[in-house]
């Protein structure tokens, strides 16, 4: 982890955060004098969930919320300090009751945005998504693929998909939910959700670290106070993503790998192709066969981080996906 998004303003100095090496997106509680010229403060946060009434913005209509957002961004740009304007959105990306007809304006108002719909843990989201025209009929919200879908939705509301970076929020326990059928996410589900977001072109992963599941060993801050074994799994998942940053920061290629029920992303770096794969919405587990682009000469696929290889036969290879959150990264010589 390298960015503190909307760092809490609790009386600590900004330097006490950035001296650890962390970058910061400063919230509106921080004054310009407190932030100063600190080079590790890279952005200004605007508002949280302005695409829903009665939350981050105080307008009585969505139009008023949008204007409030635009005013805040104008103020930030007036600072002329080189820092980007950031916002977090939520249900507006569903394209139903929230911010009707305005979500493209909310997206274009800022330089980068995240979205938070906690699909694994919030049970009532299934009903909300079933009413969403873009949601595939019969798809289960409590899946990794639901996080990649949210990135797709953000991109749909951009004049050019991906013109500004899109981030996905992933919960790290049970994020202040109180319904009897709400759930606590597992580390394996967290990892799958993060990779689903990346496969769908997320440019950042935000982790919500607040918790109220009441389980022994869990604290309110569900990253720093998590049980040691859980924390180790989350740390390993994040390290795996960071290790592939040089690949992830390259341009993706348009390619259909032909494996039914999967989501894939193709990239290339230093003479190797990388195919990232996970289970898609309504996709099943089990055996999947992938087709490689013409011109790839490698006869062995390295499954990154899993200490195994797969033979390529006639430009194809087959692998297994045990769970809905299973994901694999394939490296092949070009």
Predicted regions and their residues:
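Glycan-processing catalytic domains of CAZymes
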Residues: 1-334
């Amino acid at each position: 982890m390298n960015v503190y998004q909307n760092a809490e303003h609790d009386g600590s100095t900004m330097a006490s955060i950035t001296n650890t090496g962390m970058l910061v997106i400063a919230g509106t509680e921080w004054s310009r004098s407190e932030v100063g010229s600190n080079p590790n403060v890279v952005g200004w946060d605007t508002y949280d969930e302005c695409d829903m009434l009665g939350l981050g913005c105080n307008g009585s209509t969505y139009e008023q919320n949008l204007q409030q957002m635009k005013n805040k961004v104008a103020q930030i740009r007036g600072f002329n300090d080189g820092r980007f304007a950031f916002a977090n959105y939520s249900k507006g990306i569903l394209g139903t009751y929230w911010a009707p007809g305005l979500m493209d304006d909310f997206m274009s108002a800022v330089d980068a945005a995240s979205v938070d719909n906690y699909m694994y843990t919030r049970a009532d989201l299934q009903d909300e998504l079933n009413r969403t025209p873009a949601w595939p009929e019969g798809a289960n919200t409590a899946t990794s693929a639901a996080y990649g879908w949210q990135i797709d939705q953000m991109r749909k509301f951009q004049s050019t998909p991906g013109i500004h970076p899109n981030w996905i929020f992933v919960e790290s326990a049970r994020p202040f939910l109180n319904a009897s059928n709400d759930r606590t996410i597992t580390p394996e589900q967290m990892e799958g959700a993060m990779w689903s977001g990346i496969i769908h072109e997320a440019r950042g992963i935000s982790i919500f670290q607040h918790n109220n599941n009441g389980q022994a060993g869990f604290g309110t801050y569900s990253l720093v106070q998590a049980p040691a074994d859980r924390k180790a799994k989350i740390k390993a998942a994040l390290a795996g993503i960071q290790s592939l940053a040089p690949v992830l920061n390259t341009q993706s290629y348009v390619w259909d790998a032909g494996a039914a029920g999967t989501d894939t992303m193709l990239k290339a770096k230093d003479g190797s192709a990388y195919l990232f794969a996970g289970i898609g919405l309504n996709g099943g587990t089990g055996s999947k066969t992938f087709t490689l682009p013409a011109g790839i000469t490698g006869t062995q696929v390295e499954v990154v981080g899993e200490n195994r290889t797969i033979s390529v036969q006639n430009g194809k290879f087959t692998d297994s996906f045990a769970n809905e959150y299973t994901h694999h990264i394939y490296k092949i010589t070009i």
